[in-house]
């Protein structure tokens, strides 16, 4: 079969071993059938653009397989979750530092090869790679266990090539073993939606028997609900979601009430976790917060389209009476490890929709359009 290809230069940023290679971009999505052990397939982002303008922002390419450096591992990728953060990277709200880049930060795979001085992991181990790709390990934040706040924090799929590919490299210290109870595709969303949701739940300071609100009910929201019901069985959970399917799903999973993001909850809430990319739900959540309550914003950024809604903030209604607002910034390896142990104990099996690697654009468009029931995951190999 004749396949037209285009060659572009790319600087690979998969770890300490940095090199300049070439991407071979297939103008079709059919790659040559000839096997090449030194090549891999990947979905690559070449430029920033809104999804409304380009519904296929990622291109299927063939690229040289990376080699693990000192204390690194080569991961054969089996699954990778699809996250709202990828939309932010594609559309430029949290842009990658360099292009082209391979997105994806909810990576499940097996160790194919280890680099020199690697001792913790061995070939065949099943591991996960989360949003945290690397931190300096030496600053005050890292030394205090807050590596998520490190100024040199590197994010998987944004600052280094991620999991929308057949292989990736990562420092073995930032790869986390995956419990056997989870399949590959169901483990993937636990690394981001689950781990960051778990961190948000901890940051609320929740006590059993109090009332918890969840604003937004995508991948992270439905996992937080399951975790909260397990850890705090006497806590009533109220869900605010933008469409009827999400609200019905929340009720199926045990929410005592589910309404629109603009509705008033039937009771004041002691804690609310917001997982939306918008400002309006923040203002409405503060209105539903109990005196002395805490709102935790679980979002890497907020979009500007409804920023004017902040003008509706009224100090006496939304902020007075010692209401608190706290944000979540990234995750630590401890968050991911603790959450995976907890999820295996419950066991917490997330709802997923599977897509092929080459259909990553379709998954992203559905996510953008709000077609959500559980988590979207790319299944490879």
PLM feature segments, named:
Residues 135-215:
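NAD(P)H dinucleotide-binding glycine-rich loop of Rossmann-like/cofactor-binding domains
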């Amino acid at each position: 079969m004749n396949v037209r290809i285009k060659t572009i230069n790319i600087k690979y940023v998969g770890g300490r071993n940095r090199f300049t290679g070439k991407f071979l971009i297939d103008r079709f999505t059919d790659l040559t059938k000839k096997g090449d052990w030194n090549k891999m397939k990947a979905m690559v982002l070449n430029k920033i653009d809104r999804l409304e303008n380009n519904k296929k922002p990622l291109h299927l390419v063939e690229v040289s397989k990376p080699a693990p450096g000192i204390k690194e591992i080569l991961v054969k990728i089996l699954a990778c979750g699809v996250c709202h953060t990828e939309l932010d990277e594609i559309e430029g709200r949290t842009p990658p530092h360099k292009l082209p880049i391979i997105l994806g930060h909810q990576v499940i795979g097996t160790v194919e090869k280890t680099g020199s001085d690697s001792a913790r992991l061995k070939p065949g181990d099943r591991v996960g790679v989360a949003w945290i790709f690397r931190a300096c390990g030496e600053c005050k934040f890292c030394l205090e266990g807050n590596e998520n706040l490190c100024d040199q924090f590197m994010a998987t799929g944004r600052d280094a090539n991620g999991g929308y590919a057949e292989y990736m490299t990562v420092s073995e210290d930032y790869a986390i073993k995956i419990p056997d109870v989870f399949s590959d595709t169901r483990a993937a969303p636990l690394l981001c939606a689950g781990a960051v949701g778990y961190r948000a739940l901890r940051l609320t300071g929740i006590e059993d028997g109090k009332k918890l609100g969840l604003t937004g009910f995508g991948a992270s929201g439905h996992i937080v609900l399951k975790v909260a019901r397990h850890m705090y069985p006497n806590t009533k959970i109220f869900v605010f979601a933008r469409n009827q399917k999400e609200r019905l799903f929340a009720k199926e999973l045990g929410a005592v009430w589910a309404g629109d993001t603009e509705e008033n909850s039937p009771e004041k809430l002691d804690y609310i976790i917001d997982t939306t990319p918008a400002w309006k739900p923040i203002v409405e959540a503060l209105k539903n917060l109990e005196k002395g309550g805490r709102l935790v914003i679980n979002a890497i950024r907020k979009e500007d389209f409804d920023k004017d809604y902040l003008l509706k903030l009224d100090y006496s209604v939304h902020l007075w009476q010692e209401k608190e607002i706290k944000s979540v910034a990234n995750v630590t390896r401890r968050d991911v490890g603790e959450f995976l142990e907890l999820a295996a104990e419950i066991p917490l099996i997330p709802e997923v929709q599977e897509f092929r690697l080459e259909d990553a654009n379709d998954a992203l468009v559905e996510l953008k359009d709000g077609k959500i029931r559980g988590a979207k995951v790319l299944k490879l190999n």
